[in-house]
Amino acid sequence: MSLLIIPKEEKKKEEPSEVLIDTSTAEKPEDVAREFIACYLVGYDIIRLRFRQRATEYRAYIKDIIRRKLVGVETIEESATHMATHCLLGHVEFPVKDALTRMHVLAQSMHKDAMMALKNGDFSLAKDVAQRDDEVDRLYFFVIRQLKMAVQNRFMIEEIGLLTSRDCLGYRLIAKSIERIADHAARIGQVTPTLKYPIIDNIIVSISEMSNTSIRVCQEAMKSVYQLNIKQANQAIAKTSKVTKLEKETIEQILLAKLNVRTVIGLRLILESIRRTAEYGADIAEIAINLAKKGKFS
């Protein structure tokens, strides 16, 4: 076994990294967007684009992606055939743990509002919840970018708020789980307007109980991450069985209520999303246990 010591003074201020995307081989704007996001995630500071055809269409699409999906990216140059962007927000200003906390708060708020929209038949609120998913995606991409850069540059580990490089995979999985929780909240928002109201009160009450339990799983899971608390993580995981039990009971209520087919299908999708939310919370709790053990090992 060997020990590698990296002196602090070796750290040097690096020049911004650049990459050029030539759009001439792209068949559609989505192809360019995927390449642009890949460059962002890898950690390039300046991303340049060269347009040869359909420049106006491609430029508008990339600007929309930047606005909706990416944190800290600004356009610094623009012409008829070229465009350059710079990622201005650094890891020191917005550490990974802060970004994860913000993601969790947004995802939890989306879920609660989606349930309120379901309860009240508020289609406007349901639509708003679905649209908020972009904000969670923006933070998710930012976290992945920071973690990828930290793996490549060990000087960044402490700067982004982590202890060791071994934490990077765990936090990446946590970010993905939170992003999926937000996706399921958005799906509830999308499904709600397809339901036929009124819906029997006892069904709404049962769905709400299942939702509240699911949210508690996620809350306790995130607390276990922040505190590296194995006992709390196990408590969160244990609660998922109650969510599964409530789902089965609520499905029975729905089938007995003789609702129209479209509403039955929609409610089943909503129940599935609530259950999946709890399962992603349990995944986060399991990662918290791993991080706690790694912390003791290191």
Predicted feature residues:
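Cytosolic, long alpha-helical scaffolding segments
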Residues: 1-298
